[in-house]
């Protein structure tokens, strides 16, 4: 029940984010003297509408987005006689850019507001990858009976018997130097018998010997392959996890800005790798193991939202929504039509071109003919639609689940 509720709530949150994105365009367009004919949430048949002033507001039947119909976005649009002077393409460049940027800006504002709220209520995590193999705890070695399910074990584990304890930093195991906990775990899984281990405690290097215990773990034999039981080495240690940092009303402001900056860098890295993940998506659709690092659609995002609510992880719900808004804003600034960034690029191009022409004593050129750009726009749309269909299919047949 809570899982279904979470899906619905996250889908509604996405729709609200899209509606606010369009509100950004609407508000700035009206503020700069442009005419907005229609503002609608959803597509398809109209369920409800009302007119306020010169703008018609409404809700349509298919809740998969929204639109803001600004008069004269392009020079090829047909205008009424009283609309000509207020056409968007005739306005000053700064006004056009402001209107176009306002949509993505709303997504960024939503992201910042959510991060600020998380900082106050739950605290902010550290997004930076660990650079040392810090031991968080030691324990006995339990066999993984099923995926994510460990058996019982008692007594100290090999690491504890070798003298390791929480807070120690492992720098070398066997003949291999390690820099992160994941590096160390990968090395241990391949070893057996008694091996030397070097760790630091209070700045002092200590060498000991640890008995690698063979145990069962569910492992992937290759990228995207199914998890299968395998016998690997283990020493009974857990990673050190940094607790979220809590902030006050004022201290949360710079913390939010810093965290948003770090998150932007991480999101940028993820977006750049999307083309390399498409093969893994196709593999997942065919029945292979779904890589949790593969891109997802709003369907997959809603499923993740359902998982977070089902397990009471509201902080993850809001954080994921903040991240999604950051992604939506960034994608919309891509300088290609039909994205907002494509329209911004055209407005800036026209301004630079006309400045050069004016400097040469030549009359300004006509606005860019969008009809000539339609072939390129269609190419982008084909890729976008194909990407959406691919991710939606993967999310329906083999979704990413947080707790399975």
From Swiss-Prot:
Keyword Chloroplast (UniProt): no
Biological process terms in GO annotation: proteolysis
A GO term, aspect molecular function: metal ion binding
Location relative to the cell: Cell membrane
InterPro entries, alphabetized: PDZ, PDZ_6, PDZ_sf, Pept_M50_Zn, Peptidase_M50
Binding positions (Zn(2+)): 21, 25
Major location category of this protein: membrane
CDD domains in the record: S2P-M50_PDZ_RseP-like
Keywords attached to this entry: Cell membrane, Hydrolase, Membrane, Metal-binding, Metalloprotease, Protease, Transmembrane, Transmembrane helix, Zinc
Active-site residue numbers: 22
SMART domains for the chain: PDZ
Membrane topology, record value: Multi-pass membrane protein
Cofactor(s) listed: Zn(2+)
Pfam families in UniProt: PDZ_6, Peptidase_M50
EC number: 3.4.24.-
Residue ranges of the TM segments: 1-21, 104-124, 314-334, 373-393
Family matches, as PANTHER family: MEMBRANE METALLOPROTEASE ARASP2, CHLOROPLASTIC-RELATED (PTHR42837:SF2), REGULATOR OF SIGMA-E PROTEASE RSEP (PTHR42837)
Function: A probable intramembrane site-2 protease (S2P) that cleaves type-2 transmembrane proteins within their membrane-spanning domains. Regulated intramembrane proteolysis (RIP) occurs when an extracytoplasmic signal (possibly oxidative stress) triggers a concerted proteolytic cascade to transmit information and elicit cellular responses.
Protein name according to UniProt: Zinc metalloprotease Rip1
Organism per entry: Mycobacterium leprae (strain TN)
């Amino acid at each position: 029940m809570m899982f279904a509720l979470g899906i619905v709530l996250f889908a509604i949150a996405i729709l609200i984010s899209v509606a606010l994105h369009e509100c950004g365009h609407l508000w700035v367009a009206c503020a700069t003297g442009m005419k907005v004919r229609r503002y609608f949430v959803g597509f398809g048949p109209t369920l409800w509408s009302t007119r306020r002033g010169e703008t018609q507001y409404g809700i349509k039947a298919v809740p998969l987005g929204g639109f803001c119909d600004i008069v004269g976005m392009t020079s090829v649009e047909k205008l009424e006689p009283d609309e000509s002077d207020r056409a968007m393409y005739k306005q000053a460049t700064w006004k056009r850019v402001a209107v176009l940027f306002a949509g993505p800006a709303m997504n960024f504002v939503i992201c910042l507001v959510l991060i600020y709220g998380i900082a106050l209520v739950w605290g902010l995590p550290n997004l930076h990858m660990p650079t040392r193999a810090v031991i968080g705890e030691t324990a006995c070695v339990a066999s993984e009976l099923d995926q994510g399910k460990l058996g019982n074990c008692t007594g100290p584990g090999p690491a504890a018997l070798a003298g390791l304890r929480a807070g120690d930093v492992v720098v070398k195991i066997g003949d291999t130097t390690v820099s992160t906990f994941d590096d160390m775990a990968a090395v241990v899984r391949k070893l057996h018998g008694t091996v030397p281990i070097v760790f630091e405690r209070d700045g002092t290097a200590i060498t000991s010997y640890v008995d690698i215990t063979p145990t069962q773990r569910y492992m992937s034999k290759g990228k995207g392959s199914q998890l299968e039981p395998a016998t690997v080495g283990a020493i009974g240690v857990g990673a050190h996890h940094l607790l979220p940092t809590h902030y006050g009303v004022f201290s949360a402001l710079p913390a939010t800005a810093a965290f948003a900056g770090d998150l932007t860098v991480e999101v940028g890295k993820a977006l750049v790798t999307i083309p390399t993940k498409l093969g893994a998506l196709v593999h997942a659709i065919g029945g292979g193991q779904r890589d949790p690092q593969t891109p997802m659609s709003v369907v997959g995002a809603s499923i993740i939202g359902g998982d977070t609510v089902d397990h009471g992880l509201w902080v993850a719900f809001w954080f994921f929504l903040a991240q999604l808004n950051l992604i939506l804003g960034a994608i919309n600034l891509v300088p290609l039509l039909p994205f907002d960034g494509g329209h911004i690029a055209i407005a800036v191009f026209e301004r630079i071109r006309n400045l050069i022409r004016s400097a040469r004593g030549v009359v300004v050129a006509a606005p860019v003919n969008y009809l000539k750009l339609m072939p390129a726009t269609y190419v982008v749309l084909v890729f976008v639609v194909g990407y959406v269909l691919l991710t939606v299919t993967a999310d329906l047949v083999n979704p990413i689940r947080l707790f399975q």
